[in-house]
Amino acid sequence: MTDCWYIPEAVADRRDENRLSPNVPASYEVLGEAGIFYRHFDSEEVNDNIEGFIQPLLKKLNYQSYDVVNLSPANLGAEKFETLAEQHFMEHIHEDDEVRLILEGQGYFDVRDINDKWIRLLLKPGDCIVVPAGMYHRFTTDQSKCIKTLRIFKEAPQWIALNRGPEAEEKPARKEYLARLHAPAETAVGAVNGRTIFSLRYPLKLDAELTVITKRLLEQHSKQPLALAIYLTGSTDPTTGESWCPDCVLAKLHVARRFAELQGTYGKEHAIFLQLPVERASYLGNPNFFYRTHPILQLASVPTLLVLSPAKDAKEGGDVQWYDLLDVKVRTCDVDRTDVLNLE
């Protein structure tokens, strides 16, 4: 997407940007935490050609059917256009994922974050978004009042909206969505437990959060050897249920095996696993992505596995970071063939 930002609960003109003052930007990581999936296709390749573009796209995304919707007063007539515009801007959920690819024009999707705050997403040609079933959202064109969209469906094309209220809250799709939001995050080695398995979603918060975790772990394990495995992998693509990164899908089993080896050597309570999900839209084509430029992570490609152990003679202090307390012993993109136990 071109941009995303928080907006107030009430807006005067839905077709304006309606940014907060000062502006509060959102991020792909915030959207990913709420279940939103985003991908951008080359706008020069995006079109409504059935055999040349749409059918191959459906196969790639594992969907079965589609339709093309052209929303504008010129196409629908002013009265019908405004009626649909009002309907689309009512906060609602669907019982199926809502998958949209912008072909022409532009518009705004408003979605609720995990704290029930509105985030506005500006979508332009080539932008594809998956709004998960059960998530409250709404849509509007911008002031151009013109957008052409490819709608993608698992089965027959349909658009059934359940406006926010008691009925929507009781739908299985809504309950399942909320359950997923509050469920422990899954990693390559099992569910996050806050003790030996962790997952940190936000790159810019990594150092602060991992420093707290590291200091606590070193205090708890002061009399026992400790190994920390950090696994950087592509985040989950909801259209497949797997990582968007094919190599990460293949590496998942090998990562689990290597971590089991660490557990066998250090003990299950002294082998620690941290998964860092990498959002496709933040990472691809971005040389300044935080994990790429981080002094320790130095991410060159995903997947990447690092194994660290406590640094000798490390001294804790108020401004000491996690990477001052740990030494990198193993760094690999080829998990299957790497010895993770050689930490000397």
Swiss-Prot record:
GO cellular component: cytoplasm; nucleus
Upper lineage: Eukaryota, Discoba, Euglenozoa, Kinetoplastea, Metakinetoplastina
Keyword vocabulary terms for this entry: Amino-acid biosynthesis, Cytoplasm, Dioxygenase, Iron, Metal-binding, Methionine biosynthesis, Nickel, Nucleus, Oxidoreductase
Record InterPro entries: ARD, ARD_euk, RmlC-like_jellyroll, RmlC_Cupin_sf, Thioredoxin-like_sf, TXNDC17_dom
Function: Catalyzes 2 different reactions between oxygen and the acireductone 1,2-dihydroxy-3-keto-5-methylthiopentene (DHK-MTPene) depending upon the metal bound in the active site. Fe-containing acireductone dioxygenase (Fe-ARD) produces formate and 2-keto-4-methylthiobutyrate (KMTB), the alpha-ketoacid precursor of methionine in the methionine recycle pathway. Ni-containing acireductone dioxygenase (Ni-ARD) produces methylthiopropionate, carbon monoxide and formate, and does not lie on the methionine recycle pathway.
Organism per entry: Leishmania major
Residues annotated for Fe(2+) binding in this entry: H92, H94, E98, H137
Protein name: Acireductone dioxygenase
Reactions this protein catalyses: 1,2-dihydroxy-5-(methylsulfanyl)pent-1-en-3-one + O2 = 4-methylsulfanyl-2-oxobutanoate + formate + 2 H(+); 1,2-dihydroxy-5-(methylsulfanyl)pent-1-en-3-one + O2 = 3-(methylsulfanyl)propanoate + CO + formate + 2 H(+)
Amino-acid positions noted as binding Ni(2+) in the UniProt annotation, renumbered to this chain: H92, H94, E98, H137
Biological processes per GO annotation: L-methionine salvage from methylthioadenosine; methionine metabolic process
Primary residence: cytoplasm
